[in-house]
Amino acid sequence: MLHKASPALSLLSSGYTGGGNLFPPSRNSSNLLFSPSGSRFSVQAAKGTNTKSLTGVVFEPFEEVKKEMELVPTTPFVSLARHKFSDDSESAINDQINVEYNVSYVYHALYAYFDRDNVGLKGFAKFFNDSSLEERGHAEMFMEYQNKRGGRVKLQSILMPVSEFDHEEKGDALHAMELALSLEKLTNEKLLKLQSVGVKNNDVQLVDFVESEFLGEQVEAIKKISEYVAQLRRIGKGHGVWHFDQMLLNDEV
């Protein structure tokens, strides 16, 4: 690192004509020796110079990394990438993976129901199939993140969903959409719980991942499905359900 001479030193160097050291070294100095050379001074570091004072070093990577080097696992089955990632966070992510897969499975059952020939609501079938794929995508995002942080993905059992969604009073369309709204709110609660686990364990990276990738999107999903429920309650079980289905099919709602 190069250091420019201060103005004070420049003035002294231009007017000094004597020999020897202008500033003799002392125990409290930085051990810099000033030697005259004609009309100039040469600055040299004496033996034993304090390099921190000379270079302004505030970070010594080879010293500070020693502690981290000691923490690098040597056994073949332990993650090398894991850092500041608690067991609680790892377990909570696995739980959220299971939530996303279960919700995806219910949506897939709804898709299969509305795609039947004796139900024939293709718009609802498309909506729930897209929803199923989206939730599965969320599960895969959490799996990828788990591996990225050095955790271990542990898939859990998925409950078998019901296959009949007709409702004598509400009809199948409204009943299914109310179920979807409840699932989205439940998913939001689970995401908030996962976020709180990150906060509790001072895992700012997990908190950022949940907040930036999921929480905002979850609010949008709840709002959209809430509007669908309100509209279906207005039209009842009659001919309006078919028109609503066509709007879903053509992405007009």
UniProtKB/Swiss-Prot annotation:
SUPFAM superfamilies linked to this entry: Ferritin-like
Superkingdom in the source lineage: Eukaryota
Record's subcellular location: Plastid, Chloroplast
EC supergroup of this enzyme: oxidoreductase
Assigned keywords, A-Z: Chloroplast, Iron, Iron storage, Metal-binding, Oxidoreductase, Plastid, Transit peptide
Any one GO biological process: response to oxidative stress
Disulfide bond annotation, renumbered to this chain: none
Region of interest (Extension peptide (EP)), ranges: 46-82
Reaction catalysed by this enzyme: 4 Fe(2+) + O2 + 4 H(+) = 4 Fe(3+) + 2 H2O
InterPro entries documented for this protein: Ferritin, Ferritin-like, Ferritin-like_diiron, Ferritin-like_SF, Ferritin_CS, Ferritin_DPS_dom
GO cellular component, one term: chloroplast
Entry binding sites for Fe cation 2: E135, E184, Q218
Pfam families: Ferritin (PF00210)
Chain residues that bind Fe cation 1: E100, E135, H138
EC number per UniProt: 1.16.3.1
Record domain Ferritin-like diiron: where: 83-236
Record CDD domains: Euk_Ferritin
GO molecular function, one term: ferroxidase activity
Stretch forming the transit peptide: 1-45
Principal localisation: plastid
Swiss-Prot/TrEMBL induction comment: By abscisic acid (ABA).
Family indicated by similarity: Belongs to the ferritin family.
Function: Stores iron in a soluble, non-toxic, readily available form. Important for iron homeostasis. Has ferroxidase activity. Iron is taken up in the ferrous form and deposited as ferric hydroxides after oxidation.
Subunit architecture: Oligomer of 24 subunits. There are two types of subunits: L (light) chain and H (heavy) chain. The major chain can be light or heavy, depending on the species and tissue type. The functional molecule forms a roughly spherical shell with a diameter of 12 nm and contains a central cavity into which the insoluble mineral iron core is deposited.
Name used for this protein in its record: Ferritin-2, chloroplastic
Source organism of this protein record: Arabidopsis thaliana
